[in-house]
């Protein structure tokens, strides 16, 4: 039997992001990935718009920061992912997208 363990330093920002989503009724799913956590907005299915990770291979992991895929300005960033983001920075984009696509918060 094997167990997956999330490194404590990789959990802080994903859990803060999940807390912000909960407080604002923004749907998300959270799970373990490569020794860290992944937060998917709004789901982890093919309907996923964006996700944020902090794990063994993510940009920003040494500082405990998030790497985001989706809702990234690929032209400005030069990549399909953007790293070294705080939970607040990711949440700001998710919240804006949620309001733009659903009209009101949490509905």
Model-derived regions, located:
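Amphipathic, interaction-prone secondary-structure segments
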Residues: 15, 19-67
């Amino acid at each position: 039997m094997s167990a997956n363990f999330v490194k404590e330093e990789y959990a802080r920002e994903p859990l803060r992001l999940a807390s912000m989503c909960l407080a604002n009724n923004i749907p998300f799913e959270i799970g373990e990935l490569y020794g860290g956590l992944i937060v998917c907005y709004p789901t982890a299915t093919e309907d996923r718009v964006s996700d944020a990770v902090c794990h063994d291979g993510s940009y920003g992991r040494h500082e405990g920061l998030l790497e985001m895929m989706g809702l990234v300005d690929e032209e400005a960033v030069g990549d399909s992912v953007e790293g070294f983001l705080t939970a607040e920075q990711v949440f700001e984009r998710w919240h804006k997208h949620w309001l733009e696509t659903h009209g009101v918060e949490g509905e």
